[in-house]
Amino acid sequence: MKKILVAEDTESNFLLLSIILRKDYEILRAFNGAEAVEICRVEHPDLILMDIKMPVMDGLEATKVIRTFNEEIVIIALTANAYDSDREKAYLAGCNNYMAKPVMAAKLREMIHSYLG
């Protein structure tokens, strides 16, 4: 089973994402960007759903760090900010794609499937 790391500090958002994905994927959790970096080093997930605004280290900084040791992993930025400038910042940090919250379950599954098959 493919592994997805959900880097999300808000419990309700994590639970929603987990419910959407747990049938088809093994779900890992990070509460902040620093944890996401460490889990990525150890667990080697196939894809990361990266919240942008998190404590300790934000999602953009975590993405930049992850890209220093893993250029292949798929990283999808998740944020409540749906501005074009936020999307551009996510891509510049190294994210493969971007989705505004609240996420639509079918759209998220489709996006993940396009990367993981």
Where are these regions (language model features)?
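Conserved Asp/Asn-Gly motif in the active-site loop of CheY-like receiver
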Residues: 30-34
